[in-house]
Structure formats: C-alpha cells, structure tokens
C-alpha cells in the first residue's frame, strides 16, 4: 500500500532520461547471438548473491514496516547491488587465475528478480499489518474486552512455524495464477509496466562500456555512504542507554515540539528513503504531520471530558487514540477506493480499445511497424514457453493444500471462503496486473481491504476479526505476487532473459523469502519492543488493520463520539484531493497532497516526515547544482544510507538479545531542572 503510493508518483528521473534510449544502450546484434540457455542464466553464484541481498533488504524493509509502515521502492537499488556483487565476484576470481563464466545481463536480471522476490515477502507478508494485528498486544491496544467485536479468542501470537507455512500456502498460489497470460499481457497488449521497464533499462545500461563506467561511480558512492551510515548508527548506539535517550530524542525544534513528535532523529534510513521518494510524497507526509500533531490532536486533547471521558487513558480506542486510528483509516480508504475505481475504469477502457483495434485489423498494422529488434525480443520471449499444464497443476495443488491447511491454522476462516477466494483469484490478479501494467500501481492492498470488510461482516462477531485479517492476507498475497511476476516478465522481455529462468528465480526468491521473512521479523520481535505506541517500533498498521476488521464486524458503533463526522470529512477530502489532482493541469495538480501519505504521520508522528524532507532537500540542492550527476548518483547514495543504517540492526539486535545495553543515556531537559 505505502510502496504502491510511491510507485505511482515516483517515475525515477533516471527512468525518464534513459527510457527512450533503450535501443542505444546495447549492441542488438551481439546481444541476440550471445544469449545463454535458460538453465545457464540461473547460477550458483547468482543464488548466493540473491540470498545475501535478499537478507540485507529483508532486514531493512522489516525495520521500515515496524516503525512507520512506509517502504520505498528498492528495486533499482537491488539491481545495482546485484551488479556490484557479481562483477566483484568475477573480477576477484579472474585476478586469482580462476576461469569463470562471463557475467551477463541475463544473470543480472535473474539475481535482481530473485532478491526482490525474497525481500518482497518481508514487505507484503503482513508482519507489520494483518498478521501482527492478530497478536495480544494489538488486541489490547484496540480496546480489549471494552470494544464490541474485539474478543480475546480472536488472537494468535506470532510464531515462526505457522507464519512460514501460511506464507508458503498463499504466495505460491499467486506465483502461478497468471503464468498462462504472460504473452497476452507483455506482447499482445504491450503493457509498459514502468517499474519493470526502468529496471531493464538500468540493467541493459550496466552491461555496456559506457554503463560500466557509470556503474563504477555509483559503486564508489554506495560504498562511501554505506560506510558513513553504518559507522554513524554504531556511534549513536553508545548514547541510547534508555527508553528516551540518544540522538533519536534530540529536541531539534525545542522541547515542546519534541513532545508533539516534531524533531530530527538523525535516521539515515529515512533520509535515504526521502531521497528516493518524490518531493510530493515527502511534502504530503509533512503536511499530514502538521495537520494532525500540530493542530488536530492538541485540539481534540483539549476536549477531554466533553468528547470522551477524562478518566480514559490516551491510548484507549474510545479516547484520543481512537480518533488517530479511525481518521487515518478514512484517509486510506478514501484514497484506496478512488484509485481502485479509477484503475478498473481505465483498465476497462483500455481493454475495450485493444479488442476493437484487434477486430479492425489495426493490431496487425502496428505489428508491421515493429523494429526487427522488437520482433526478435518477442520471439525469444515466446520460445522458452512455460507449459500450461505446469501452471494449472501447480495452482490446483497449492490451492487444495491451502484449502485444507489454512482452516486448521485458523478455524475462524471457513474452507468455503478459501475456495471462493481461489476461484476469484485469477480474475482479480489479471485485473490488478493489467492496471499495474498501465499505471505502475499495485492495488493489491485495496483488494485485500475489500476482502477484509466482506469476510469480517460475513464471519460473525466471534470469528469476524480473525477471518477478516487472514482473508485480507490471502487475497492480497495472491493478487500482489501475480502483478510482481508480470513486472519481472517485462524486465526479462527487455533484457532478453528467458521466461523460464524468470519464473524459476521468482520461485526460488519466494521460497527463500518465506523462510527469511519470519526469521527477520522474530529478530525484531524478540530484541525490541514491537507494538509499543510510545517506542520506536510502533507497527502502526497492525492497529489500523485490526480496527478495520472490528469496523467490519460492528459497523460505526466502534467509533468514539464525533469521530464518524470527522471520518466522513477526511474520506471526502481524500476523494476530492485525488479528483483535483487528476483534473487540474500537471503544474498545479502535481502539488496536491497525497492522502495516503498524509495518513501515515497521523499515527506515527512527525519525526520521520522531517527526516524524509531532509532527504528531499538534499536531492533538490543536488539537482540545482548538477542535475546530470544527481540523476546518476542519488539512487546509489540513498541506497548506501539505507543499507548502512539497516545493516546495523543485525549487530544491535544480537547485543540486545545478549543483554548488552548501551553505556550512556543522553537526554534533554529544561534548564530550570538542571540545578
């Protein structure tokens, strides 16, 4: 959901500048002659590289998921790391006098696909949302027994075993749902899949003499800022020996602003994320933070005793926390519903035009206009076909296993709900993948939310919350992975990589991710206070998703006083903001805030929005000084900042589990208390 928002806004400037030069970045004749067989595109060194990159990025995105829930698109960064890893590998072996296979762009594509498939499970596996929403802590934060529809039986504590099994059951079904339609989507409909195309352009560019020189500069920038970020995170650790200690509690704008979450916390992860995200995303985050923590929450807090009982704690769902959660839900639902209808409408019109063109013979004339290189790509893409029976048998087998196993794991979700879900999955997956091909927007979270409300309402009060949350994960996983696979097929089509090797690498990455993601989650869950709304790892979307399920069970009776009217207003604002954005000229519309981005700081606070705006400011200043160099180096520098800070999580987690505490607590207080 959060990465979807950044995908639709973030047409990377590198993509804009080089997309038209795709033909120029490669010697087509040599490329077509030197394509290795599909089995040789998958190598042992490639799987090792994918595993290492997948683990690193799983740790990074898990931290982002459990702190704010906002995850930028890291595919370009993963492609760069894959290139760095394998180019270094081959050079070291060559210097040692060991003969090794040449590093091809097909192998680069396979490694990038496998690594992204691995860490995508950590992003979208529900560890910060629908699965974590089942635990006891989130149940208590949602009001416990004081909230109608929120029953203590509707909980399930996280466990490596059941989480791993659930991921295997749901993810592999989605992997096979749309395989038979790959030719229709990529060749017949010629869907662009902008993220897949951008990744292909980057990889093609790496494997040219000019691109190799550019890559060396990017590698140097990545290593430099990775080292700085890691050392800075290590340095900060020494001063964080308490709950409110360290640089993350630095009162940048004063102590009163600190209380309202307005401060710069020196997080290189979010500075790097801000460099990757478009300026409008970061501005929207800051606008949401000012509106909520700067204006609304202080005003509503002042109405204690009038709008809600003064005896209630602030974190009660019938107190201030209820307004925070449900108003952010209304923004998310308003934005999601608008985008959902818009994409369905756009998909329908586009398909109607395509069918009309085919019937009138226009598609043949378009085919005649294709270049020889395009026709050759199409031929290679079709040549290594994936047998229909493999997809059909695999889909049926995984579906049967899921229909049997998931109701055993979650008795609240009846088997017939799963049967209906798997019957609808291919059509839902096709709709989402087609829309993603046109707009680069993965609407899987919105399909999941629709399933959440329907199942929560149908399953009844006792079972509704669990059925809604698990059903949401089921639909979301199938629909999302189907769309991701089509993005990868587009990348493979443009880099002359076999669809078979792409499917196998996606399957390997998914299998690795289904094991790595739960282990990564438990690293955080055991080492840190995950779910504490006053701490760093708030996991805000776990609370959001559980309350959406309660809303599906109980309706509007779950809301605190006057909250419904505010929710109506913010829902309408989300729809209106999107309408204005789409209808006005780009010069004006592009500056309308994004409701989905605004919703995140409503729960989390304003500190990370300030971090990300610092990242935006760096990119803006860099572009003003040297636009070409900025376009080349920003992704590498941002990736270095994110990876260095993210990798420090591993040693810090080990230290926390071993009971080793930082030696110093650096805190701040008013000068009147200094005596």
Swiss-Prot record:
One of its GO terms (cellular component) is plasma membrane. It is found in: Membrane. The keyword NAD does not apply. Its main location: membrane. GO terms for biological process: developmental process involved in reproduction; iron ion transport; response to nematode; seed development. Signal peptide: none annotated. GO terms for molecular function: oligopeptide transmembrane transporter activity. Expressed in leaves, anthers and pollen grains. Restricted to the vasculature. Induction: Slight induction by manganese, copper or zinc deficiency. Inhibited upon iron deficiency and induced by iron overload. Pfam families: OPT. Keywords: Ion transport, Iron, Iron transport, Membrane, Transmembrane, Transmembrane helix, Transport. The chain crosses the membrane at residues 42-62, 66-86, 114-134, 159-179, 219-239, 280-300, 325-345, 386-406, 408-428, 450-470, 504-524, 556-576, 602-622, 630-650. InterPro entries: OPT, YSL-like. It comes from the Eukaryota. It is a multi-pass membrane protein. PANTHER family: METAL-NICOTIANAMINE TRANSPORTER YSL3, OLIGOPEPTIDE TRANSPORTER YGL114W-RELATED. May be involved in the lateral transport of nicotianamine-chelated metals in the vasculature. Belongs to the YSL (TC 2.A.67.2) family. This is Metal-nicotianamine transporter YSL3. It comes from Arabidopsis thaliana. The lineage of its organism: Eukaryota, Viridiplantae, Streptophyta, Embryophyta, Tracheophyta.
């Amino acid at each position: 959901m959060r990465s979807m928002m950044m995908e639709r806004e973030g047409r990377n400037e590198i993509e804009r500048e080089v997309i038209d030069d795709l033909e120029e970045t490669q010697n087509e004749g040599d490329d077509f002659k030197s394509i290795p067989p599909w089995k040789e595109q998958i190598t042992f060194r490639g799987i090792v590289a994918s595993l290492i990159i997948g683990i690193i990025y799983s740790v990074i995105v898990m931290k982002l998921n459990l702190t704010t829930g906002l995850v930028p698109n890291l595919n370009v960064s993963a492609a760069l790391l894959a290139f760095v890893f394998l180019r270094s590998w081959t050079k070291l072996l060559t210097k040692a006098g060991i003969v090794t296979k040449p590093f091809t762009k097909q192998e680069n594509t396979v490694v990038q696909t496998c690594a992204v498939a691995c860490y995508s499970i950590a992003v979208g596996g529900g560890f910060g949302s629908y699965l974590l929403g089942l635990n006891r802590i989130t149940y208590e934060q949602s009001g416990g027994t004081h909230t109608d529809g929120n029953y203590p039986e509707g909980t399930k504590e996280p466990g490596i075993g059941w989480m791993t099994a659930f991921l295997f059951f749901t993810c592999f079904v989605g992997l096979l749902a749309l395989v038979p339609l790959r030719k229709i989507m990529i060749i017949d409909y010629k869907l662009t899949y902008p993220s897949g195309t951008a990744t292909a352009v980057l990889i093609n560019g790496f494997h040219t003499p000019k691109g190799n020189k550019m890559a060396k500069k990017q590698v140097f920038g990545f290593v430099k800022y990775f080292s700085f970020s890691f050392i800075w995170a290590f340095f900060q650790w020494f001063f964080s020996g308490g709950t409110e200690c360290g640089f993350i509690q630095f009162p940048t704008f004063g102590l009163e602003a600190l209380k309202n979450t307005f401060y710069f916390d020196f997080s290189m992860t979010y500075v790097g994320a801000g460099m990757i995200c478009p300026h409008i995303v970061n501005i929207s985050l800051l606008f949401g933070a000012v509106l909520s923590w700067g204006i609304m929450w202080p005003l509503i807090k002042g109405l204690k005793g009038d709008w809600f009982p003064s005896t209630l704690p602030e974190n009660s769902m019938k107190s201030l926390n209820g307004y925070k959660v449900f108003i952010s839900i209304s923004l998310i639902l308003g934005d999601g519903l608008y985008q959902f209808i818009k994409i369905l409408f756009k998909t329908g019109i586009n398909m109607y035009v395509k069918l009309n063109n085919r019937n009138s013979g226009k598609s043949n004339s378009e085919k005649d206009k294709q270049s020889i290189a395009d026709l050759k790509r199409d031929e290679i893409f079709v040549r290594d076909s994936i047998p229909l029976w493999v997809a059909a048998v695999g889909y049926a087998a995984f579906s049967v296993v899921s229909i049997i196993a998931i109701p055993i794991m979650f008795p609240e979700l009846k088997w017939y709900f799963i049967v209906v879900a798997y019957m609808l999955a291919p059509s839902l997956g096709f709709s989402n993948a087609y829309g993603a091909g046109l707009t680069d927007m993965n609407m899987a979270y919105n399909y999941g939310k629709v399933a959440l409300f329907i199942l929560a309402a149908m399953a009844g009060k006792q079972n509704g919350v669990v059925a809604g949350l698990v059903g949401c994960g089921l639909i979301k996983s199938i629909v999302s992975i189907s769309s991701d696979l089509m993005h990868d097929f587009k990348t493979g089509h443009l880099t002359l990589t076999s669809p078979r090797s792409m499917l196998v690498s996606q399957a390997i990455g998914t299998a690795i991710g289904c094991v790595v993601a739960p282990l990564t989650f438990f690293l955080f869950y055991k080492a840190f206070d995950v779910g504490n709304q006053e701490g760093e790892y708030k996991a805000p979307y776990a609370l959001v998703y559980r309350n959406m399920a309660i809303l599906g069970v109980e309706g509007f009776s779950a809301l605190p006083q006057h909250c419904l009217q505010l929710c109506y207003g913010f829902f309408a604002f989300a729809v209106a903001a999107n309408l204005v954005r789409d209808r006005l000229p780009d010069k004006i519309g592009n500056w309308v805030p994004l409701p989905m981005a605004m919703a995140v700081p409503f729960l989390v606070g304003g500190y990370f929005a300030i971090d990300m705006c610092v990242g935006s400011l760096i990119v803006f200043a860099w572009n003003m000084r040297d636009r070409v160099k900025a376009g080349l180096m920003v992704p590498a520098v941002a990736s270095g900042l994110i990876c260095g800070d993210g990798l420090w999580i591993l040693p810090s987690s080990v230290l926390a589990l071993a009971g080793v505490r930082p030696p110093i607590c650096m805190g701040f207080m008013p000068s009147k208390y200094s005596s």
